[in-house]
């Protein structure tokens, strides 16, 4: 769970009664490991945006930005849905910053927008542009984050259906798509800015080589 800034694990259950924290996520100051999975559907705090639930590994992007001046920064989250990393960026930049969260799939963008509204920071704009369109803001963003669409080997552990969707052809298509996205992302990044690239892959071959 992410979003309980300044709290200690022992107090999480006092602040949010539906949760029991087993400890902190080592690489995310606002992240907590949950002792069990509660029924989020019935938790009013979850629906109010008091916290967001995501894999601990997804919160590692915050560690990558340590030492990068993010307060007041402009961040482009180019492949943003469902919004877990977007909420983290929104917290990092503060009210004086801006996060542009882009998702080309309108159905997924709707989920993204809902999560952004719940988070309530007021510094996120959700767009549904192709990468080349949103990246026409050349050299404008301080940070560009690409959580690239991939062949999804990292999902095998928690989603058995993902194994059946895997194919060599899908890997090749994803690699080509990633290459296009990265080239556009680079255009949008200001000189001296920070580019974050992540996938849920177990192998290096589907990722761009140049």
What are these regions (language model features)?
Residues 1-31:
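N-terminal auxiliary segments of SAM/dcSAM-dependent transferases
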Residues 72-79:
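Conserved class I S-adenosyl-L-methionine
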Residues 94, 189-190:
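Helix-to-beta-strand junctions that scaffold the AdoMet/dcAdoMet cofactor pocket
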Residues 107, 146-183, 201-202:
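Mobile active-site "lid"/loop adjacent to the S-adenosyl-L-methionine
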Residues 113-136:
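S-adenosyl-L-methionine
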Residues 136-143:
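A short acidic, Gly/Pro-enriched loop at the edge of an enzyme's catalytic core
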